[in-house]
Amino acid sequence: MNIKYLIKKDIEQALIKINSNYTYEVFIISSKKIELGHYQVDNLMKISSRLKIKPYKLFQKILILIEKKKIYKKIIFSHPGFINIFIKNEWLSEKLEIPFISSRLGVKYIYPKKNIVIDYSSPNIAKEMHVGHLRSTIIGDVTVRILEFLGQKVIRANHIGDWGTQFGILIAYLEDKKLLKKLKKNLLSLQDLDNIYCQSKKQYNSNELFSKKSREFVVKLQNGDQYCCAIWKKLVSITMLENYKIYKKLNVTLEEKHTMGESFYNPMLPKIVEDLKKQKIAIEKNGAVIVFLDEFKNRMGDSMGVIIRKKDKGFLYSTTDIACLKYRYQNLHADRIIYYTDSRQYQHLLQSWTIAEKANYISKNLLLEHHMFGMMLSKNRRPFKTRDGNTIKLSNLLNESINRATNLIQKKQPNLCKKKLIKLGEIIGISAVKYSDLSKNRNTNYIFDWDKMLSFEGNTAPYIQYAYTRIISILKKSNIPLHKIKMKIILNEESEINLAIKILEFEEIILLIAKNGTPHIMCKYLYQLSTYFSHFYENCSILFSEKIKIRKSRIKLSFLTAKTIKKGLNLLGIKTIKKM
């Protein structure tokens, strides 16, 4: 059910009858003031200008063509040029039956079904995931859930950083410090590897003999040396084992089978370079292989060069990304590829896409989207870091949130048993972190605030979760089985009508996220829905209405609200709580 689309379709068809050459899109928005209508045509003045008909006269022509349709209660003109639309209560009641009986809340599948690759999370090996990985991981996962809900074939791609010079450095350091036995016996944790990586990097930058040895190990690894490959596999295994624990804690759907890291594409790189040279897209210059792109200019106005193979025959990220793109299109048959990386990767991705298209590795019809995102900031509006200036580890952030949530619940419910306290603390703590991030527009930076994200007021996970538990409690107290309520919902009060319309907006929200990858729209919707229910609860007696029909109607409307909240949170990867 998409009310805006139905209104838009009606008005556009009317405009075609008024003028057969009509080709302009009608924009429908939700009214900010309910007394002016439920919906509004936002661009009537532009349309009237193009059709050379005065706004009011155009309104009259449209009105004659659509006013008798079942959906409309009242359609009025507002100066200087707006159409305000009121929806019939009876029509709303009839349409609420669809989400009531449907497990999908009446949301239709999208056809044709498309193959969509979503590139997200992408942690580095031998390094702990930090707060910078949170946004890519959870925003990407919401997009996966939404598109799968709409019936699309989604291919998750966890493009891990598991190849390159850093592995030669790590192997050399582990050998020098006699740490390989510990590694083989699983006595080194990911935290140990993270520290080892930092120390080995310092040694690589300051010790020429060590850096030479590291480069030799890189070459051996690239040539498939068994000794180096065994160490490399162990490093990958230790890292990803910990990362999967974080994914599970975050309720993220990434699994081992979704990992397609840099190493996966490494065997393809020599052929890519040779083919680009053969097609005369790439040239050799000073021992390196470079692609010069006229589409990108440097400060001097010259075509920018993208190096795809270094003088030492080593490959770069750009080479890997070209091979990756070719594989996703030709082997995975992708119709659309979405990348969840920060804004700094934008030019790099555009260059890789341009080269792949020039080489005919991909079709011009392939949809390539970079869903970039901003940074998590501290209250002083600087990158969110520890007091000593280090990047905050994601596992530490999640544990801190669980501890804070547990303490908060314990203060509110001191008699709660330990088992329930631990379970509630984990659900609310993880939900608070996820929702706090997901509720912000991904294109912007946002300030991380413990107090706000764990608050039971405002647009937060605890507020939405509490709204859900309150409705579940009301339904239990009603003692009226929902399957026995055969009557349609009766809508008389303004708060009932507003809640009904908001429930029916669910599909519209789903489609917007599927198109733009912006989960903050769902968060805003769930907050509004919960707030509308609160107004309904305050203004309408649910359990104690004298008329049994009204009582049943309001219980049914309450159930529909809870059902919608649960589905919305589920698509955000956030768990609901039946009792809080």
Swiss-Prot record:
The keyword RNA-binding is annotated on this UniProt entry: no
Keywords: Aminoacyl-tRNA synthetase, ATP-binding, Cytoplasm, Ligase, Nucleotide-binding, Protein biosynthesis
Gene3D superfamilies (alphabetical): Arginyl tRNA synthetase N-terminal domain (3.30.1360.70), HUPs (3.40.50.620), Isoleucyl-tRNA Synthetase, Domain 1 (1.10.730.10)
Location(s), subcellular: Cytoplasm
Reactions listed under catalytic activity: tRNA(Arg) + L-arginine + ATP = L-arginyl-tRNA(Arg) + AMP + diphosphate
Enzyme Commission (EC) number: 6.1.1.19
Molecular-function GO terms, alphabetical: arginine-tRNA ligase activity; ATP binding
Principal localisation: cytoplasm
Residue ranges annotated as motif 'HIGH' region: 123-133
GO cellular component, one term: cytoplasm
PROSITE patterns: AA_TRNA_LIGASE_I
Enzyme class: ligase
Keyword Nucleotide-binding: yes
GO biological process assignments: arginyl-tRNA aminoacylation
CDD domains: Anticodon_Ia_Arg, ArgRS_core
Subunit structure and binding partners: Monomer.
PANTHER family membership: ARGININE--TRNA LIGASE, CYTOPLASMIC, ARGINYL-TRNA SYNTHETASE
Family: Belongs to the class-I aminoacyl-tRNA synthetase family.
Protein name: Arginine--tRNA ligase
